[in-house]
Amino acid sequence: MQLLTNGSRWHIHHGDCIPHMAEMPEASIDFSVFSPPFPSLYAYTSEACDIGNSEDVRTEAKLHLSFFYRQLARVVKPGRAIVVHVAQIPRMKRSGEVGLHDFRGLNIRIGERAGLVFEYDWCVSKNPQSQAIRTKSRELQFAGLERDRVRSRGSLPDYLVKFRVPGDNAVVVDSDCQVSRNDWIDWAEACWTWREIRETDTLNVRAGRGEEDT
């Protein structure tokens, strides 16, 4: 664990989240928002303990995530919220499987087993044309549509899954300068549309963009 910088009310650390959270005081976090590595889809490191290197979503990745959620439920304060960004994961041909892994459902089930309360999830729609070009998914491409429509499917959305830690929230979050009523009308929509979200406006977008990325 490495402390990168800090202020009077915050600290920024760099380290492996699972062993690092084990060192953190209980009930020391006010809010957690994160996106877990998607198993077998993106490789971030060569480490065996990296969730992204898990080949089997239903066993290996499930075990990794269970350690994570148990520590997360311990360090977040009672009554506070946790928001997780996830998506469903296509099964790879190399595994001999077809269809989708229910990664959204897996995170919900593991979170509940760790003691968290599953409260809600927002759906974030995706541009099907952009996703077809980026992923080269035959289920989305026009070629697949014109070859055999039985195999066609829609674009895969993202999800924002909201958990809450059991207990009473000691400090009420009610500042009127953070979220206006008009903002809340938009944010409370069950599905956020891709036309209103700038998907490429992310951290390190220039450094992380490939030559064929749109």
Where are these regions (language model features)?
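Core catalytic lobe of class I
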Residues: 1-214
